[in-house]
Amino acid sequence: MEHTTLEKFKTEVHRTLISKLDLEKLSRVNSSQARQAVAAMVTEILSDQRVPLNFSEQEKIQSDLLDEVFGLGPLEPLLRDPKISDILVNSKDRVFIERGGRLERAEASFRDDRHLLQVIDRIVSRVGRRVDESSPMVDARLPDGSRVNAIIPPLALDGPSL
């Protein structure tokens, strides 16, 4: 399946998943059980859609949606890579990483500015901070010691950056 078509389909599956999720029930189980339950829901949604996907496409959609629900979406694969020392999100579709002292473009991207804003909000809310139009810049230290700097409009002229 073509990349843009796969992304559109993944967005539809994500919407369906969100509408079916019982957050109260998920909050009562451990994270491993919650991940298994959501993975099973994604598998069920994919089979209900009856769209011809090969195994790797199904795995990619499931992995991406689990990262979206339980983590920081498209940043999760980058965060799992121990060789990456820095992640720079200049815009929704311009993500760079530092690996081995070299800056390189990453494959990661966000659906749109709103998606990037949601991920930024998830990150800064973990440390009791907020970022919005009245406070469009945040610089914070995360619990693991890493730093995060986010800028959103109106300060960021080309959309949110992280």
Describe every region a protein language model picked out.
Residues D81, V89, R94-L162:
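P-loop NTP-binding catalytic core
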Residues M1-E104:
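N-terminal anchoring/assembly modules that precede and organize ATP-driven motor systems
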